[in-house]
C-alpha cells in the first residue's frame, strides 16, 4: 500500500513537468526569441520571473505537506498494539538495499530535480536576456545614427534648396542682364547713328569753314595791299615831317639867341636891385616861424619833395595874430615841409601809376597793384631845370589856391585817378600869398597867371593863406562850379608854365627872390610820408618881398578864427633838436605848378630810432574832388610806438596806399611824435582814448578843399577802420549811412572790403543796408569774400546777407572767394548753404575759378564739404567733422568721402567749351586734376569748341596722370597653399605674400598682361634671392629667368584673376581692363606647384630653401630609402621631412600606387618594442611567409635625439640594409612569440635629429643610413634666414624693396648678424649643442618705424631660448664628477660657484659680442633695452684678468680660502701683484688686464640691480673654484674672444657703456686690490674699482688630482703651448693646518688672480 500510495505521487509531479515541456516545445515551435521586440522580451522576462517565484512557493508548500502525508502513509496503517506490524516495519528497514523495495518515492529527490531544472532554465533565460539587451543597445545606436543621417540629409536638402534658389536668382539676374545688354546694344546702335549724323553735320560745317577761310585769305591779301599803300603814304609824310623839323630847329636857334638876350637883361635888373637898400633882414629872420612836416611810409632812403616857403612880413598885426609855435625835432632822412603846407596829388602822368579800372568785371576787388618806384636821383633833383641859386633853402612864392578849390584829381587827363588802388605819387606844398614873378617875363603872361590863380585864395596880412571851411548849406552845384573853375585854372596854369620856367644857371639877384617854380610837374621821387619827425624853421635870411604888381587882388581873407594848440611848456622844451647848429626846413611848394626839390645832402641825419610808419590812408571810397582832412587820417591805435617794432599799425593787414590829399590848417604847427601819445588830450589825431575836445574846431577849420559833407567822412572813417570817428558820426542825427559815392561804394562796402570787422559790426548794428551793391553789382559780402576777410564774411552772413548774390558779371561771393584762394571764406559760405553751381556770364563756375588759380584746398572744399545741420552752421565740431581732409587722402582713395557735387557741375563747360579739367590740365595743376579725376562722373573725353579733349591740352605730367587715370592697380600675390600640419615648424611660414601691384590700363592686351605677370614674378624671385637689397627696378635689367633659389615662371601651377582661373598666354574676349572691372577682381593670386603636384616649388618659396637642394633631398630618399636629417635645433628638419614625404606620396599615387605616411614622435620613453609594433602595424616589417603588397609606406621618426640611436635601431640596421626575404630577422613580439620578418622594399624611412653632430655609440648607426647634415654655416641654412627676412620686408612694403639705408633693412641685417655671430661664438666655445637653427629667428617682427619692437623681441628670444640653451651647454661642458657618487645631473642642479661665474661670463660676452653689437638703435635707446637682456651686467674684467694657475703634475687648480679673520695682521701678507707669464720665448700673445676705472661706482648699483643672482650665488663665505681643465679652457677661450680681432670687438662698445670695460693691452697696470683685514688701509672704497675686491685672493695648490679622485673629461678646445709650459713649472705648496694657514708667495709662479665684487668673499667649496 505504501508502495502504491507512494507511486501515485510521482505521476502527479511529472504531469506538470510534462505539460511544461510540451508547452515549451510548443512555444519554441510558435515563436523565436531572436525575433521578439523589446516590449515582448520584457513581458517574457516578467512572466518567467513570476513562474520562478510560483515554483518556489509550490516547492515550499509541497515540502510542508509531504511530511505529514509520509508519516501518515508510513505509519498510519499500523497499530502500535499489533507487534507483528512493528516486526514487519523493522524487517523492511533492516533488509538490504537490493532486496527491499522502497515503500514510496523520495520527495527530496524530486524537489532537487525540479530545482536543478529551474536553475538551468534561469541561467538560460539570463543569457538570453543579456543577448537581448546587447541587441537592443546596438539597435538604439543604429537608430541614433539613422536620426543623425536623417538630420544631415535634411540639412543637405535645405542647403540644396538654398543653392537652387541662389542659382535661380543668378539665372534671373543673368537673363535680366542679357536683356539689359541687348537694350544697351540697341541704344548704342542708335547713338552710333546719331553720332554718324553729327559727323556728317560737322563735315558740312567744316566745309563751310574752309570756304570762309578762303574768303578771309582773300580779304587778308587785300588788306596787305592796302597796308603797303598806306606805308608808302607814311613814308611821304615822314619826309614832310623831317622838313618841318628842320624848320623848327632853325626857329629854336633863334629862340636861344633871344634867351641869351633875356639873360643879359636879368643881370642888369639884378645889378639895379642890389643897389637899392632892403629891409632889416636879421630881425625878420628871428621872427620867422616856419615849421615843415615830412610824412612818409618809407625808410631813410626817400625822395625829396619840392616846397616853397611863404614869407612872413614884419608888423605889429602879425605879432598879435601869430599862432603858438614850438621847436620840434627834425626828421631823419626825409624831406621837410612847411607847417602851412598842403599835400596834393602829383599831376604828372609819369609820377602816378593809374589803378585798375573800375569798369572791370571784378578787378577792383582784388588787392592793390604794386607801385612803380622811380630810380633815385643823383645829388640834387630840381624842378624845371637846374637851380639858379646856391642857398640851402631857396624859396619862391606861388599863387594860392582858391579857398574852396580841390586839387586836380581824376578829372584832369594825365593825372592819377583818385579811386586808384595804387598809391599815387604826391608832394607836400603850402600856398603863398606873395608870388615871385620873373622880371624878364612878359607882363601879359604874368597877368594871365594871376588872373587864374590870384583869386583862388586871398592872402592874409601875415602872408599866410587861410581857407574858411565850407558851410553845411553849400549846394552840390556850387561845389561842382568850384571844381570846374579850379580845373580850368590848373589847365591854363600848366600851359603858361611852359613859358615861365626859370632859366638854368641864372644867378639870383639880391632883394629879389629866386626864380619861382611855375613849370609843369617834374618826375620827382616818391614822397616819404612821416608823422613822427618835424623840423624847425631855419634861422637864415628870408627871401625879400616881391614888388606888387597891378591886377593882383589885395582883398583881405574871409574872417576865420585861428585854431591854436596849447602845448605844455615842459613838453615843448624837449621837442626841438638841432643838427650842426642848423635846422633844415624845406620851403613850401605850390600845388598845381610844380614841386621844388631840395638837395638831399642837406637833410639832417638824426640818431633817434626810426618809428614804424603811420598807416596810410586809402581814399578810394571818396568821390572825385573830395579832399581829406587831417582828422580823417587818424585811426584807433595808429600812433607809432616809442620803440621801433613793438607795435603794428591798426590797419596793417590792409593794402598800403597813400592819401591823395593831406590837408593841414595853415595856422596849426604839428607837434613831435614824443608829444603825440595816445593818452595826450591835446593830440591832433583821434586815438584809442576817445574823442579829443580840440578836434571839434578842427573839423570846422579850413583846408585845401571841402570835406564834401558828413557822408564822405563816414566812408573815409569806415575805409580806414576809425571806430571812434565812425561811432561819433553814427550817433549824429540825419546822417545817411547808406550814402554811396559815384562808383556806388557805401560805408559798409568800404569797411568790408578793407577788413574792418568792428566798423562792419557798427554799421550793421546801425541798420546799414547789407546787400547794397555798387555800380558793378558787388555787395559788401562780395568785397569781403574777394579780399579774404572771413570775419567780415561771417558777420555779414549772420546779418542775412545774400550769399547767392550775383554781380553784373555773374560773380557770386563763393566764386570770388575761390578765385582768390580764400579757403576760410569758402568754408563759411559753403556752411551757410550757398549755391555751388551758379555760373557767370562767361560760363565759369566756382570750380572753374578754384582750378584756374590752382587752389587745391578750395577745390577740395567745393567737392567734399557737406552742409552741416541747420542751426549748426558755425559749430566748429560740426564743421570740422564734415570737412574733407585737405592734407591727406591722395594715397588712399578708399578712405575718401563721396563728393557732394554732381557730375554735371564737374563737367560743365564755359563759353569756350572748357571744363575745369581742361583748365587744370592746360596749366599743369596736377593736384587739382587728380582731385577732379577722383570724381567718378568726370568725363575726360569731353571736347571743347575746338574739338580738343583734356588730354590734348594737358601738359606732360598731366598727360601721364590722365593715361593712368583709369588704370586698375591690382595687387599680385603668391600663394603656396595651406602648410600642414602646423606643428612641423611652419608657424612662421607665410602662406601668401603680396609682391607688387600691376597697372592695367584700357589699352593693355592679354599678351602684355602675361608678360607683366611673368616679369613681376621673375623680378620678385631674383630680388628675394639676391645677396643685397635690390629693388624691382634694379633686377629688371637682369635677363636671367631663374633665380638663385630655382624659382621662375615655370614654377606656377595656376593663376586666379579674382575667382577665375587663368594661365599665362591665355586670352579672353574682353580686354584685361574690362575683364577685371566686370569680374570685380580685387587681386591676382599666383599658386605655385607644391607637393600635391609632385613638385617642391611652393616648399621652396615658403621655406626659402633652394629648389635644387630640395630636389636633391627627394632623390636621396627615393634612392636610399633610409635618410636621416640632422642639424642644430631649429633647422626645419621636421618641415623638410614632412614636405618631402608629401611630395613622394603624391608622386607614388600619380604612378598608380597607394601610399601612406606614418609619423612617430620619439621621446625618452619610446622603446624598441614600440618601434617594432610600429613597423609591423604599418606593414613595413612583413612576415617571411606573407607575400608583399604593392602599398608604399613612408615612416617618419621625429626627435631621434631624445633617445639612444644605438639602442633603438640596433636590431633593425641589418634588415634595413638588406630588404629581401633572403635576409630575414627574427623579432619577438610582446606576447613572447618570435617570428621572422623582413623589411618591405617599398618602405621609406626618414628621421630627424636636432643635434649638430653625433657622439659616442650613436656613431655606430651612421654607416647604415644616408645622412643629410643641415649646417648653420652652409647652405641651405646659411642663406635661408636672409632670404626669408628679405621676403618678409618686401611683403611688408607691398612689393617694394626699401633702400639699404632704410631703418627696416638695418634692423633686419642686425637680426641676421645676431644669428650668425651667436653661432660663431658658440662654435668657438666648443658647445655645438647650443647652436641654433634659423627657425627661431623667422618670427623677427618687421615694423617700419618701430625698431624697438625688434629689440624687445630679441630680448624675449634671448631670455627664453638662447640664454637657457647657452647656460645648459656651458654647464655640461664645465661640469665634472668630483666624487664617485656625484653625477653630472647633480652638477647641473647644483653648479659650483666657478661654474656659475663661467656661465655668467659667457652670457655677458655673447650678449655684447653677438647681440648688442651692431644694433642700429641709438646708444640712449639701446641702454634702455639692455636691462631686458639676461646676463648683460656681468663684470668682464673677471674673465680678462684670469689665467690658469701654474700647477705641478697631479695638482688641481683649486682656489684657496682667504683668511678673513680680523686678528690676522696685514703685515704678514704682502700685496700681490699681477704675475704675468713670461711668454716671450713661447710666442704667445700676452693676455691683457682691464684698467680698473674708479668712476664706475655709480653704474655698479645699476648692474647689481640687474644681476641680483650673481650676488646671491657668490656670497661672503664662498670663493670661486675652477676644478678642471675644461673650466680653465673655457675661461681662456672667453679671454681670447674678448680680445679677438677676428670677431666683433666689444671694446668698441665698452668705452661708451657702463657695464663694459676697455681691455688694455699694455699689461703694465698694477693690481688695485688690498686685504680687507687691514682696516687702516689708506685705499678708500671710492678709489677702488667696483670690480675689484678689498680682500687679497691668492692662488694655492693644496691637493693633488689623485687625492681628489677627479675623472676629468678632456677638452675639445686646442690647448695653447703656454699652458703645457706652465704645467711643467713647479710652484711651492703652501702648508695649512686647521687653525692657521701660512701663505707663501712664489714670485716665480705664473698665475693671475680674479677680481670679483668688492662685497663678495671667495671660498673654496667644501670637499
UniProtKB/Swiss-Prot annotation:
Q: Where is the composition biased (Polar residues)?
A: 583-593, 1582-1599
> Which ranges are annotated Basic and acidic residues under compositional bias?
1645-1663
Q: Where are the ANK repeats?
A: 709-739, 743-772, 776-805, 809-838, 842-871, 912-942
Q: Which InterPro entries match?
A: Ankyrin_rpt, Ankyrin_rpt-contain_sf, Cortactin-Actin_Reg, Cortactin-binding_p2_N
Q: Kindly state which keywords UniProt assigns to this record, in alphabetical order.
A: ANK repeat, Cell projection, Coiled coil, Cytoplasm, Methylation, Phosphoprotein, Repeat, Synapse
Provide the GO MF annotations for this entry: protein phosphatase 2A binding
List the record's Gene Ontology CC terms alphabetically: actin cytoskeleton; cell cortex; dendritic spine; FAR/SIN/STRIPAK complex
Q: Which residues form a coiled coil?
A: 119-276
Keyword Ligase (UniProt): no
User: In which compartments does the protein localize?
Assistant: Cytoplasm, Cell cortex; Cell projection, Dendritic spine
Asymmetric dimethylarginine modification, residue list: 498
Q: Which residues are annotated as modified residue Phosphoserine in the UniProt record? A: 1524
As for what it does, the entry says: Regulates the dendritic spine distribution of CTTN/cortactin in hippocampal neurons, and thus controls dendritic spinogenesis and dendritic spine maintenance. Associates with the striatin-interacting phosphatase and kinase (STRIPAK) core complex to regulate dendritic spine distribution of the STRIPAK complex in hippocampal neurons.
| Name assigned to this protein | Cortactin-binding protein 2
Amino acid at each position: 500500500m505504501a508502495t502504491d500510495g507512494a507511486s501515485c505521487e510521482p505521476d502527479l509531479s511529472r504531469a506538470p513537468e510534462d505539460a511544461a515541456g510540451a508547452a515549451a516545445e510548443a512555444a519554441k515551435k510558435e515563436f523565436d526569441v531572436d525575433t521578439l521586440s523589446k516590449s515582448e522580451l520584457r513581458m517574457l522576462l516578467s512572466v518567467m520571473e513570476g513562474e520562478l517565484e510560483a515554483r518556489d512557493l509550490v516547492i515550499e508548500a509541497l515540502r510542508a505537506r509531504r511530511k505529514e502525508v509520509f508519516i501518515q502513509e508510513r505509519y498510519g496503517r499500523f497499530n502500535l498494539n499489533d507487534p507483528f506490524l512493528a516486526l514487519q516495519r523493522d524487517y523492511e528497514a533492516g533488509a538490504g538495499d537490493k532486496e527491499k523495495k522502497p515503500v514510496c518515492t523520495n520527495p527530496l529527490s524530486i524537489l532537487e530535480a525540479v530545482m536543478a531544472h529551474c536553475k538551468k532554465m534561469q541561467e538560460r533565460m539570463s543569457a538570453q536576456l543579456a543577448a537581448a539587451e546587447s541587441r537592443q543597445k546596438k539597435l538604439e545606436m543604429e537608430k541614433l545614427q539613422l536620426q543623425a543621417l536623417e538630420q544631415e540629409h535634411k540639412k543637405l536638402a535645405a542647403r540644396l534648396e538654398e543653392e537652387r534658389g541662389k542659382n535661380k536668382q543668378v539665372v534671373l539676374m543673368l537673363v535680366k542682364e542679357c536683356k539689359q545688354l541687348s537694350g544697351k546694344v540697341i541704344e548704342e546702335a542708335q547713338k552710333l547713328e546719331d553720332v554718324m549724323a553729327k559727323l556728317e553735320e560737322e563735315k558740312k560745317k567744316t566745309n563751310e569753314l574752309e570756304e570762309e577761310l578762303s574768303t578771309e585769305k582773300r580779304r587778308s591779301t587785300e588788306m596787305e595791299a592796302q597796308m603797303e599803300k598806306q606805308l608808302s603814304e607814311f613814308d611821304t609824310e615822314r619826309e614832310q615831317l623831317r622838313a618841318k623839323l628842320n624848320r623848327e630847329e632853325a626857329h629854336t636857334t633863334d629862340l636861344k639867341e633871344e634867351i641869351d638876350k633875356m639873360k643879359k637883361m636879368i643881370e642888369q635888373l639884378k645889378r639895379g636891385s642890389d643897389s637899392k637898400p632892403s629891409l632889416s633882414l636879421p630881425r625878420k629872420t628871428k621872427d620867422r616861424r616856419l615849421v615843415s612836416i615830412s610824412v612818409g611810409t618809407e625808410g631813410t632812403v626817400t625822395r625829396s619833395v619840392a616846397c616853397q616857403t611863404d614869407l612872413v612880413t614884419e608888423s605889429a598885426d602879425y605879432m598879435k595874430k601869430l599862432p603858438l609855435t614850438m621847436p620840434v625835432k627834425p626828421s631823419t632822412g626825409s624831406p621837410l615841409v612847411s607847417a602851412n603846407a598842403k599835400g596834393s596829388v602829383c599831376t604828372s602822368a609819369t609820377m602816378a601809376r593809374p589803378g585798375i579800372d573800375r569798369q572791370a568785371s571784378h578787378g577792383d576787388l582784388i588787392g592793390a597793384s604794386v607801385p612803380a618806384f622811380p630810380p633815385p636821383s643823383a645829388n640834387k633833383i630840381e624842378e624845371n631845370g637846374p637851380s639858379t641859386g646856391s642857398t640851402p633853402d631857396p624859396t619862391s612864392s606861388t599863387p594860392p589856391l582858391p579857398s574852396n578849390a580841390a586839387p586836380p584829381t581824376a578829372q584832369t587827363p594825365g593825372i592819377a585817378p583818385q579811386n586808384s588802388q595804387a598809391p599815387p605819387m604826391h608832394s607836400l606844398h603850402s600856398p603863398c600869398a606873395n608870388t615871385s614873378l620873373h622880371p624878364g617875363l612878359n607882363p601879359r603872361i604874368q597877368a594871365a597867371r594871376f588872373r587864374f590863380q590870384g583869386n583862388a585864395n586871398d592872402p592874409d596880412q601875415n602872408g599866410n593863406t587861410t581857407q574858411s571851411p565850407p558851410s553845411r548849406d553849400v549846394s552840390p552845384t556850387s561845389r561842382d562850379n568850384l571844381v570846374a573853375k579850379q580845373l580850368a585854372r590848373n589847365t591854363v596854369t600848366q600851359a603858361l608854365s611852359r613859358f615861365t620856367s626859370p632859366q638854368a644857371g641864372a644867378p639870383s639877384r639880391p632883394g629879389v627872390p629866386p626864380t619861382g617854380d611855375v613849370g609843369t610837374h617834374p618826375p620827382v621821387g616818391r614822397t616819404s610820408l612821416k608823422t613822427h619827425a618835424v623840423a624847425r624853421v631855419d634861422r637864415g635870411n628870408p627871401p625879400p618881398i616881391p614888388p606888387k604888381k597891378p591886377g593882383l587882388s589885395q582883398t583881405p581873407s574871409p574872417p576865420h578864427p585861428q585854431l591854436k594848440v596849447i602845448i605844455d611848456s615842459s613838453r615843448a622844451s624837449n621837442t626841438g633838436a638841432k643838427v650842426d647848429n642848423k635846422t633844415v626846413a624845406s620851403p613850401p611848394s605850390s600845388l598845381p605848378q610844380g614841386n621844388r626839390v631840395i638837395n638831399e645832402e642837406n637833410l639832417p641825419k638824426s640818431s633817434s630810432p626810426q618809428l614804424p610808419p603811420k598807416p596810410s590812408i586809402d581814399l578810394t571810397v571818396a568821390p572825385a574832388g573830395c579832399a581829406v582832412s587831417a582828422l580823417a587820417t587818424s585811426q584807433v591805435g595808429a600812433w607809432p610806438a616809442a620803440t621801433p617794432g613793438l607795435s603794428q599799425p591798426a590797419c596793417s593787414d590792409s593794402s598800403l596806399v597813400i592819401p591823395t590829399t593831406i590837408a593841414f590848417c595853415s595856422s596849426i604847427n604839428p607837434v613831435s611824435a614824443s608829444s603825440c601819445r595816445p593818452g595826450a588830450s591835446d593830440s591832433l589825431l583821434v586815438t584809442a582814448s576817445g574823442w579829443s575836445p580840440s578836434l571839434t574846431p578842427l573839423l570846422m577849420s579850413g583846408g585845401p578843399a571841402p570835406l564834401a559833407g558828413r557822408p564822405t567822412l563816414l566812408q573815409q572813417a569806415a575805409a580806414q577802420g576809425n571806430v571812434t570817428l565812425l561811432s561819433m558820426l553814427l550817433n549824429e542825427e540825419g546822417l545817411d549811412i547808406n550814402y554811396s559815392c559815384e562808383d556806388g561804394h557805401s560805408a559798409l562796402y568800404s569797411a568790408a572790403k578793407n577788413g574792418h570787422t568792428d566798423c562792419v559790426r557798427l554799421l550793421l548794428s546801425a541798420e546799414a543796408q547789407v546787400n547794397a551793391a555798387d555800380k558793378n553789382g558787388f555787395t559788401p559780402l562780395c568785397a569781403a569774400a574777394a579780399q579774404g576777410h572771413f570775419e567780415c564774411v561771417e558777420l555779414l552772413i549772420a546779418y542775412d546777407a545774400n550769399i547767392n548774390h550775383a554781380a553784373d558779371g555773374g560773380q557770386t561771393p563763393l566764386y570770388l572767394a575761390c578765385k582768390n584762394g580764400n579757403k576760410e571764406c569758402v568754408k563759411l559760405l559753403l556752411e551757410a548753404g550757398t549755391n555751388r553751381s551758379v555760373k557767370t556770364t562767361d560760363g565759369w563756375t566756382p570750380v572753374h575759378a578754384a582750378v584756374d588759380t590752382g587752389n587745391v584746398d578750395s577745390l577740395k572744399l567745393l567737392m567734399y564739404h557737406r552742409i552741416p545741420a541747420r542751426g549748426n552752421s558755425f559749430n566748429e565740431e560740426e564743421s570740422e567733422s564734415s570737412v574733407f581732409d585737405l592734407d591727406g587722402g591722395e594715397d588712399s582713395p578708399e578712405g575718401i568721402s563721396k563728393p557732394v557735387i554732381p557730375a554735371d557741375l564737374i563737367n560743365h563747360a564755359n563759353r569756350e567749351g572748357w571744363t575745369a579739367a581742361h583748365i587744370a590740365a592746360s596749366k599743369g595743376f596736377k593736384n587739382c586734376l587728380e582731385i577732379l579725376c577722383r570724381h567718378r562722373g568726370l568725363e575726360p573725353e569731353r571736347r571743347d569748341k575746338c574739338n580738343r579733349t583734356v588730354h590734348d591740352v594737358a601738359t606732360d605730367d598731366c598727360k601721364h596722370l590722365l593715361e593712368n587715370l583709369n588704370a586698375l592697380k591690382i595687387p599680385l600675390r603668391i600663394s603656396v597653399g595651406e602648410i600642414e600640419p602646423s606643428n612641423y615648424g611652419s608657424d612662421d611660414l607665410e602662406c601668401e605674400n603680396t609682391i607688387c601691384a600691376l597697372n592695367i590700363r584700357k589699352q593693355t592686351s592679354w599678351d602684355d598682361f602675361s608678360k607683366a605677370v611673368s616679369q613681376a614674378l621673375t623680378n620678385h624671385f631674383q630680388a628675394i634671392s639676391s645677396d643685397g637689397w635690390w629693388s624691382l627696378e634694379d633686377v629688371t635689367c637682369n635677363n636671367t629667368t631663374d633665380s638663385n633659389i630655382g624659382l621662375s615662371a615655370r614654377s606656377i601651377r595656376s593663376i586666379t584673376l579674382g575667382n577665375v582661373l587663368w594661365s599665362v598666354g591665355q586670352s579672353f574676349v574682353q580686354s584685361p581692363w574690362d575683364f577685371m572691372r566686370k569680374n570685380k577682381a580685387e587681386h591676382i593670386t599666383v599658386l605655385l606647384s607644391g607637393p600635391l603636384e609632385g613638385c617642391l616649388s611652393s616648399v621652396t618659396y615658403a621655406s626659402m630653401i633652394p629648389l635644387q637642394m630640395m630636389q636633391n633631398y627627394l632623390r636621396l630618399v627615393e634612392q636610399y630609402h633610409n635618410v636621416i636629417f640632422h642639424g642644430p635645433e631649429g633647422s626645419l628638419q621636421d618641415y623638410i621631412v614632412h614636405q618631402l614625404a608629401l611630395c613622394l606620396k603624391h608622386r607614388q599615387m600619380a604612378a598608380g600606387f597607394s601610399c601612406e605616411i606614418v609619423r612617430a614622435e620619439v621621446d625618452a620613453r619610446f622603446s624598441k618594442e614600440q618601434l617594432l609594433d610600429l613597423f609591423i602595424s604599418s606593414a613595413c616589417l612583413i612576415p617571411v611567409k606573407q607575400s608583399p603588397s604593392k602599398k608604399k609606406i613612408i615612416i617618419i621618426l621625429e626627435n631621434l635625439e631624445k633617445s639612444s640611436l644605438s639602442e633603438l635601431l640596433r636590431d633593425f640596421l641589418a634588415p634595413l640594409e638588406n630588404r629581401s626575404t633572403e635576409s630575414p630577422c627574427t623579432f619577438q613580439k610582446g606576447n613572447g612569440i618570435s617570428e621572422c620578418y623582413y623589411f618591405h622594399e617599398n618602405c621609406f624611412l626618414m628621421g630627424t635629429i636636432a643635434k649638430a653632430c653625433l657622439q659616442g655609440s650613436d656613431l655606430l648607426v651612421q654607416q647604415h643610413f644616408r645622412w643629410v647634415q643641415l649646417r648653420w654655416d652652409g647652405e641651405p641654412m646659411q642663406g635661408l634666414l636672409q632670404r626669408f627676412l628679405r621676403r618678409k620686408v618686401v611683403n611688408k612694403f607691398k612689393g617694394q624693396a626699401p633702400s639699404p639705408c632704410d631703418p627696416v633693412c638695418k634692423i633686419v641685417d642686425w637680426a641676421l648678424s645676431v644669428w650668425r655671430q651667436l653661432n660663431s661664438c658658440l662654435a668657438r666655445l666648443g658647445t655645438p649643442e647650443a647652436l641654433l637653427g634659423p627657425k627661431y629667428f623667422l618670427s623677427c617682427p618687421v615694423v617700419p618705424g618701430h625698431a624697438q619692437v625688434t629689440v624687445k623681441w630679441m630680448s624675449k628670444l634671448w631670455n627664453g631660448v638662447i640664454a637657457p640653451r647657452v647656460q645648459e651647454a656651458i654647464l655640461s661642458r664645465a661640469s665634472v664628477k668630483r666624487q664617485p657618487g656625484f653625477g653630472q645631473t647633480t652638477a647641473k642642479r647644483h653648479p659650483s660657484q666657478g661654474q656659475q661665474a663661467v656661465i655668467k661670463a659667457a652670457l655677458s660676452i655673447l650678449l655684447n659680442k653677438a647681440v648688442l653689437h651692431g644694433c642700429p638703435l641709438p646708444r640712449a635707446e639701446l641702454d634702455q633695452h639692455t636691462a631686458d637682456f639676461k646676463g648683460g651686467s656681468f663684470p668682464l674684467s673677471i674673465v680678462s684678468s684670469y689665467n690658469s694657475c701654474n700647477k705641478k703634475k697631479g695638482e688641481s687648480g683649486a682656489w684657496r680660502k682667504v683668511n678673513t679673520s680680523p686678528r690676522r695682521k696685514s703685515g704678514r701678507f704682502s700685496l700681490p701683484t699681477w704675475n704675468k707669464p713670461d711668454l716671450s720665448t713661447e710666442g704667445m700673445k700676452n693676455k691683457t688686464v682691464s684698467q680698473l676705472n674708479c668712476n664706475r661706482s655709480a653704474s655698479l648699483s645699476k648692474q647689481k640691480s640687474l644681476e641680483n643672482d650673481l650676488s646671491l650665488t657668490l656670497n661672503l663665505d664662498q670663493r670661486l673654484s675652477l676644478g678642471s681643465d675644461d673650466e680653465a679652457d673655457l675661461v681662456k677661450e672667453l679671454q681670447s674672444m674678448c680680445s679677438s680681432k677676428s670677431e666683433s670687438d666689444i671694446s668698441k662698445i665698452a668705452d661708451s657703456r657702463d657695464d663694459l670695460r676697455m681691455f688694455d693691452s699694455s699689461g703694465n697696470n698694477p693690481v688695485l686690490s688690498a686685504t680687507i683685514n687691514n682696516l687702516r688701509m689708506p685705499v678708500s672704497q671710492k678709489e677702488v674699482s667696483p670690480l675689484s675686491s678689498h680682500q687679497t685672493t691668492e692662488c694655492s695648490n693644496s691637493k693633488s688630482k689623485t687625492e681628489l679622485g677627479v675623472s676629468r673629461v678632456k677638452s675639445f678646445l686646442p690647448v695653447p703651448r703656454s699652458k703645457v709650459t706652465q704645467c711643467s713649472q713647479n710652484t711651492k705648496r703652501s702648508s695649512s693646518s686647521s687653525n692657521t694657514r701660512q701663505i707663501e708667495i712664489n714670485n716665480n709662479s705664473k698665475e693671475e688672480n680674479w677680481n670679483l665684487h668688492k662685497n663678495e668673499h671667495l671660498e673654496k667649496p667644501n670637499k
